[in-house]
């Protein structure tokens, strides 16, 4: 930007004075102090200078007050040089960090510069004051300027978008985002102001009737929207409480032709309540302040304090008057074209909203019902809205609600009534706002001019992160996620498009996908559903609440990476989403209500039926709202009728918003977006104050830092070649030579001279691109260079000035000497008399000469005057002639221009006619193909009809057969039911016996159940721990110990059993049975233990095999890696051989050219010899004979040589192709060969062979080199010995023969190579076969391993089941001993110990949480360091580059300056020290990694011990005898655990110290640690999900089983009545068939009548076409005339072209002859005659050319005559058009007749039954096709008439088209009549057959299903009854099972039944109704 001093007032807020910034003193101060940024609580960041470094901390001195402080290195951020102060684009900053960005924005803001570029977008900070930078002068300053030509401004963004739209013809968008009060609305208005000024449609136009009306309306739309949609908040006095997208349409020329506004998320709740110190929408205050008395009385207005909805009364806005704003709003409405009635109706609705708030309800005494004690307010409200007061009161207090199929009056409570009134007020205002926007769009819509492009301006709130966020914040943040994704994608796309334009190598990166997980979390419809989908789903569920919604959300999305449970606000927030801008806690209160937005549909219906048309229009979509019955149905009924009737009739708020957002994003994606980020500087609304922390938060939320980061990942600094050369050529003084050089080449030379790293720059087509910081480095080098040059220049200037002063003094000294000498001489001569005489006489000598000189001058003056007059006359004559020639030239040019234009028009007409003809021919072909297709379809339908008739007959036969089978099945069903009843009776007897037995054991079972439940819980814990540990040995030892304990307890129980035998005989029998069962279980347990041991042994063998296999696999991988290296070397050698092969072929080609050169030299020598033969006559004949012989031999040898070379080249090409194929195969096999071990040997052999080949080829190349050198020697000898031609020719022949031999030899070599390549291919195939075999073997091993693992898991499950049975028996026997009472004390003691342990565990978990918080702190530090990671890497590269540059300079100047050696040594020492520090940090990082691993291992050990402790607790709970011992062990383990925790604490403290010290190295380790942690969490999560899934599946299976049982009951009840229904259905079918036949006959009759009417219409159409044909005949005559004229024109053009070709041919011959004359100097005398002849021929041709030109003029005259004839023909065509109009009238009459036909068909459709609707609709479709064809014909006719106006040759094609269409239309109508009849008959028959078939199939399937169910139930019950009888006889365990489902089982084992009487009866009924599967 140009430097400016003394800036004017507006420019002071736009431009920066760079002269102040480029201050050398400031630069030197910055360099000396090592300034950096350090964190500050007050200022965000403060400037400080580094004084001392102490390890990880740095001593700094604050620049502001000089205080010193210790700061961690990680908290320091680099500072940019002073020359980057107040930079206009922050992407240019070399050190890009939060501190630098904040400092730059702060400096510019304090200087009044509120606009700053940040990469590709613009950042705006609200100044909170008016700046003079928005005037028309500023607009004109930015108009037509590019972005970089002017300082940052919203006008620059608007201008860029406007110019891009005009140039690229692509729609544009400007996206303004930011917090409330940041200035989004104001910047939106400035954009509209700029576009309205720049693209005003009335500027430069002739129409001044309504100057700029559209632009005025566009500007006045904002005040209206602000009045109804803006409000005063704490942050902003004019806050937009809605988002809007303003779409401004432009025409092709860039003028505004219309606009459209779309709004989003109006905060309608503000209309009913406001926060403290806030206002509702402006219109309420404006209306109450500005309305006159008459208007107030009409609207029933009162004071501010009389309205409940104005929560805070009247709150004025500083600097604004609501009364004046009301007048401005009314004036804006008038400008927008609002009528007085519309304005009054709107204000009535506004007043009614206030009246809603004044309605008060009262709770009645004895009930909760609400009542309205005072209805005055209701009367006012109903008066304003046009409703009945009584109906309104009834609808509010006792609305009608649909329950089932009936409507009931439901009384409302006071809370429900208040809620309904507020909801109505909000809905009314929202609908008013929507109508207002629609009305403004209607006013801004213009249909006169078509808009081709548009610019959209988006004004929407940015990310909102409060302490607790609701549904509105979710919608806003969801929108911003989508916009940020669009920003990332678009920004980097633009950057990369420039790279592609400039031809830079670049890998495409899409940053838009980074935000996709969070977007999916919100909007995903299913699998799993997102937040909005779950909210919609929950809205439909009965008895759903916000709590159930949150539970579902956690269940579905709990594992999502962007979803978390709140940590800090656990009690307040429900869930947390990680947005782009940060973590946001959401509170889901009233989300269901907000999403449904329910209304009192009774009142809504009254509003819809209002007497006020405006109110009725607002509520016209009343059928799409959620009513009270909907909400009632959710809370009281389970999917009631209200749910069914209302579903699908409306969409929820979330769904509507998602759709509108999707539409908006689709619009924005199709545009070129321009981003404007608005920032609020403070919340006090004070000008000149900037809160650093607030701005930093907004920068993060707006993505400013992220955007710059994305921009800097590429090459953010770029400069055009010319500017780079001009600015930095000073650094490379001798790199560019003098003279002209292309800019790109010059820059490449400069870059090479600067010795830059190639990774730091890219050279494009017009610019050179640099990484961040490179230009800053070049600037520093340039400053140093300029400083040296200036110093040198000053020295030169001082020397020059000193020398010049010295020379001047010397000159003065010599002049003084001359003056002194002259003065001394004058003093001597002044008294001499002759001197006096001399001084007096000398002047007189010139007097006589002066007169002579004057006379000579006078004569000379007269001559000059005469010449001047003569020249002036000649000049006038020349000017007159020149003017005359110019006039003639202009006339000729105009004539020539007119003729060329006429010719071009004629040519264009011919091209258009040819294109039209082609189009008509294509249409004709399409029509013909359609006719053929219709015929084929008719034939297909005919065939289908025959097939369907045959199918109907088959179905009738099947129906008869199935009827007989059904009767048989009915008989079998009756017998089966009798058997089932008998079985049920037997089962009831058995159940009675079981119930008696169960009653006796009921008391005992209750206590058993309690203990078993406790043991089951402990067992579940043990099982989970066992799964985690996977230690089979520990589990086996536990089993052995438990078995021993069980044996002891069994012995004790036997003793107790003997005692109990004397007490109760019944119990003795039961205990004996239990004892027998225990013995059996013991035997089974021993067997299972043996099986478990075998399984464990097999598992050990399998693990051993697996380890061996893994070892073999690792060895194979190592071998494959070696093989890969050998293969790469082999590939390199092969490439080298290929290169040598190419070199060899090139040498052969060179040899061939050399041989041809030798032949050329021999030909030249032969010519010399012929010249000598002319001089020596005697030798002429002999030499001619010899030359002939030699020529024949040479020709023969050439042919042989050429053929040999061609064959050789073909063989080489074949070898290359074959080799290329082999290379492809080889590359395909490379990936597979990695797994094969034998490839090493094969490829080594191949390598040896290829090495051998390479050596062979090297030898061949050397031989060829030798032969080439020999050829060179022979060629030299041939040139020296010209007299020995014969010998030289012999040598050439021998050389050719040798070349042929070489070619043959090379062909043999190629064949050898080919065979070797074939061998290689065979070897590769063999290797692939071996690889496949090995892979199949590996798969077999894996399958065997999987099968063994499955067996092991099954055995483990069996073992666990045995453990459960053993534990159950143990608990039961313990209860029988009655020792439970004695053990209760110990159990309580154990529970207390357990509670203590749980407390200890909780304390440990708290400590772990503290450690987690410490880790979070470290993660924050890591995030801060991550932001500077890119800059650090860049700086590291920069430092390495500096070191390399210094090394190079050391080598250059080592011999010249001794001081440079010291400097280079110092730099080398610094480099070594830096490298040592880096190595030391790397070692620290490794030690840290080891320490972390040790900590993780200690943590795992702690977890294992914790789990062991829980296992010990379980053992304590299960074993009652060793209580004290276990407690002691628990205490010991507790102490050990606490000791380990203490050790872990110390270790973690050491780790924290080391982590704080080596934060840079820790970054890599934390990434790995996070990955491991995420993997562990994912594993746990998947395990939990699997458990939950199993649980859900079990519940689902239970529900399915219950549903199946219920269905079976229903089917059994309906089975008896099915036969009667089938018979009735058959009778109905027969009756329907008869009725259908009758209706079919009636339709056939009606169709015949229609066909007769169609024939009459066709006759009328033919008459109309006959009249049209007469018109076409007349037009054909005119076409013939045109054709003849066209033929003449074409003939003349051909003649002209032939003459032109002849002229060019003659000129070509002349040029060739001239060349021959010039070349043939020896035959000059013989060619002179030929030259004269040719000159005569040329003269003749020139005469002919002149004749052709005269003919051309005649042709032009004739062409003009033809144009006149064309004009006359056009007049004739005008007459023809009137005749064509008559034919159009006839066509319209036919269309009317067709419409009448359609009406008749509709009447027929109403008469025929519903089953024939499809047939009638098909007929309508056919008639519609005819109408479309007629309309198409009309369109083509109209297009043809338009083309006739322009050209004379279109009549023929149009008439031919009309004739073809007439003929085709006749054919189509005939075919359609036939097709209609066929289609009608076929469809009728098809429908009848399909209905009959479906009915028959349904009945057959139903009967078959019932039969199958009955047979299955019968057989299953019979089997179960038999098994039950057998088991009862044996006295063994009885199990009733539903084998059909396999999921519910009831085990009865002796005395261990666990069912009550009720349960037994229900189970019995379930068993009776369960059917086992029947195998068919």
Swiss-Prot record:
The modification Omega-N-methylarginine is found at residues 18, 1930, 1940. Residues 1125-1175, 1697-1718, 1874-1976 are annotated as: Disordered. Involved with LARP6 in the stabilization of type I collagen mRNAs for CO1A1 and CO1A2. During cell spreading, plays an important role in cytoskeleton reorganization, focal contacts formation (in the central part but not the margins of spreading cells), and lamellipodial extension; this function is mechanically antagonized by MYH9. Cellular myosin that appears to play a role in cytokinesis, cell shape, and specialized functions such as secretion and capping. The modification Phosphothreonine is found at residue 1960. Its main location: other. GO terms for cellular component: actomyosin; axon; brush border; cell cortex; cell surface; cleavage furrow; cytoplasm; cytoplasmic side of plasma membrane. Residues 661-683 are annotated as: Actin-binding. Residues 85-783 form the Myosin motor domain. It comes from Rattus norvegicus. The modification N6-acetyllysine is found at residues 442, 1241, 1301, 1645. It comes from the Eukaryota. InterPro entries: IQ_motif_EF-hand-BS (IPR000048), Kinesin_motor_dom_sf (IPR036961), Myosin_head_motor_dom-like (IPR001609), Myosin_N (IPR004009), Myosin_S1_N (IPR008989), Myosin_tail (IPR002928), P-loop_NTPase (IPR027417). GO terms for biological process: actin cytoskeleton organization; actin filament bundle assembly; actin filament bundle distribution; actin filament-based movement; actomyosin structure organization; adult heart development; aorta development; axon guidance. The modification Phosphoserine is found at residues 1145, 1935, 1937-1939, 1952, 1956, 1975. Phosphorylated by ABL2. Residues 786-815 form the IQ domain. ATP binds at residues 178-185. Belongs to the TRAFAC class myosin-kinesin ATPase superfamily. Myosin family. It is found in: Cell projection, Lamellipodium. Residues 31-81 form the Myosin N-terminal SH3-like domain. One of its GO terms (molecular function) is mRNA 5'-UTR binding. Residues 1967-1976 have a biased composition (Polar residues). This is Myosin-10. Residues 1129-1155, 1698-1708 have a biased composition (Basic and acidic residues). Residues 845-1976 form a coiled coil. Myosin is a hexameric protein that consists of 2 heavy chain subunits (MHC), 2 alkali light chain subunits (MLC) and 2 regulatory light chain subunits (MLC-2). Interacts with PLEKHG6. Interacts with ECPAS. Interacts with KIF26B. Interacts with LARP6. Interacts with MCC. Interacts with CFAP95. The rodlike tail sequence is highly repetitive, showing cycles of a 28-residue repeat pattern composed of 4 heptapeptides, characteristic for alpha-helical coiled coils.
